């Protein structure tokens, strides 16, 4: 059996896997932090504006936690392997601009956009939850758990919004 070098996340391979997913979440959250204020201004329905405002607040908290994780690991985020995700997110945002004159269609597009973004975030967040058994640092574990719980709450809010539109 080979002796793999250990990191605060576990083996080197697990560490790399973990960082790639953390970068993906950070990329998506950074995109949200940048674009949500613009989306908020274009939303028409009060419930949608409320959901966007709550997501802005939650996103800022989650980014701060992820920044702390990077700090604890002595790393900085990298969008190096996130280009496809960035393109996907920007294309979705551009689609919203195409429907800026039709309020109802635009609001539905916003809900669709947020739902797609939520799916991307939650899949990586769930993967990170699986990896937490390998993490040696309890503070990192707690930060991940807090982010995951807050992301789940965002998902519930989004599902309630979708139900209301149905």
Language model features with spans:
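Amphipathic alpha-helical hairpins
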Residues: 1-166
């Amino acid at each position: 059996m080979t002796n793999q070098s250990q990191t605060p996340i576990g083996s080197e391979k697990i560490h790399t896997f973990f960082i790639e997913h953390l970068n993906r979440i950070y990329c998506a959250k950074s995109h949200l932090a940048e674009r949500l204020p613009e989306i908020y201004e274009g939303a028409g329905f009060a419930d949608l504006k409320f959901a966007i405002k709550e997501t802005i607040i939650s996103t800022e908290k989650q980014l701060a936690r992820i920044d702390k994780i990077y700090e604890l690991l002595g790393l900085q985020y990298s969008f190096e392997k996130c280009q496809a995700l960035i393109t996907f997110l920007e294309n979705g945002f551009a689609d919203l601009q195409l429907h800026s004159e039709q309020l109802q269609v635009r609001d539905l597009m916003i809900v669709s956009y947020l739902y797609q973004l939520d799916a991307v975030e939650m899949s990586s967040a769930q993967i990170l939850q699986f990896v937490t058994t390998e993490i040696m640092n309890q503070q990192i574990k707690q930060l991940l758990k807090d982010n995951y719980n807050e992301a789940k709450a965002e998902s519930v809010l989004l599902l309630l919004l979708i139900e209301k539109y149905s």
